[in-house]
């Protein structure tokens, strides 16, 4: 996401700018600090969608200088839950849609009743896990495995990696196509080989067409996590190479 693609839309009437911290489709990490600076110069607030960024990179709201950061713990080994950091003092000035009995201000205005205490326990455990392993260590581990995956896919004839072609400055997520086979067919064949991937648009529908993909079919998505090993990557590459060699009717 080029900075100018967002900044050029910002004007005197802009009140909020929403930008992704990282693409869940192809892993790109935009220069959110530059976008935030331009938005603030225009008098706008900024909310960063950090759902796909948080599990893969250390996130510092001070460096991002955003007003709101959102994430979800299901992306970092916890339960499904929405988490939002808000610049101190800002929440009191907001008027969110809320259920009638909820308070008019404070965090309670964004909640819908009794919290999921068991979910909060899971979030705490997941956060402790990330901190115990180390966010920098996780990023280094994932980047090394991701480079292995990306280089391996580039070496397989009939495979096209969608989006950026190198492993630098991105989350360890990519999309790829196999010539002559639909993404759904590729995912099914890989599942037969006990390799789990995702296919489709990954809810990033607007990004599919600029990437040269069908808006519904999308592509095959694969990614690296803290527990991914070199062996896992090699199994995926071997399975993809096998899929390429299979006849279309398969």
Language-model features and meaning:
Residues 1-250:
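Pyridoxal 5′-phosphate
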């Amino acid at each position: 996401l080029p900075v100018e693609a967002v900044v050029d839309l910002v004007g005197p009437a802009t009140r909020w700018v929403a930008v992704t911290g990282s693409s869940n489709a192809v892993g790109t990490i935009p220069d959110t600090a530059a976008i935030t600076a331009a938005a603030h110069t225009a008098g706008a607030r900024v909310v960063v969608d950090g759902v796909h960024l948080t599990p893969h990179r250390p996130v510092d709201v001070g460096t991002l200088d955003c007003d709101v950061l959102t994430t979800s713990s299901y992306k970092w080994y916890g339960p499904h839950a929405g988490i939002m950091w808000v610049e101190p003092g800002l929440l009191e000035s907001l008027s969110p849609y809320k259920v009638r009995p909820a308070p008019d201000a404070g965090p309670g205005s964004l909640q819908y009743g009794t919290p999921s205490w068991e979910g909060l326990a899971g979030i705490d455990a997941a956060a402790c896990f990330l901190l115990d392993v180390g966010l920098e260590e996780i990023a280094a581990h994932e980047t090394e495995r991701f480079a292995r995956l990306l280089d391996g896919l580039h070496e397989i004839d009939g495979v096209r990696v969608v989006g950026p072609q190198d492993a630098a400055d991105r989350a360890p997520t990519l999309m790829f196509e196999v010539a002559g086979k639909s993404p759904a067919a590729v995912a099914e064949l890989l599942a037969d080989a006990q390799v789990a991937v995702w296919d489709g648009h990954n809810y990033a529908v607007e990004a599919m067409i600029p990437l040269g993909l069908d808006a519904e079919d999308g592509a095959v998505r694969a990614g690296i996590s803290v527990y991914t090993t070199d062996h896992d990557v090699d199994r995926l590459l071997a399975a993809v190479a096998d899929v390429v060699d299979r006849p279309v009717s398969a």
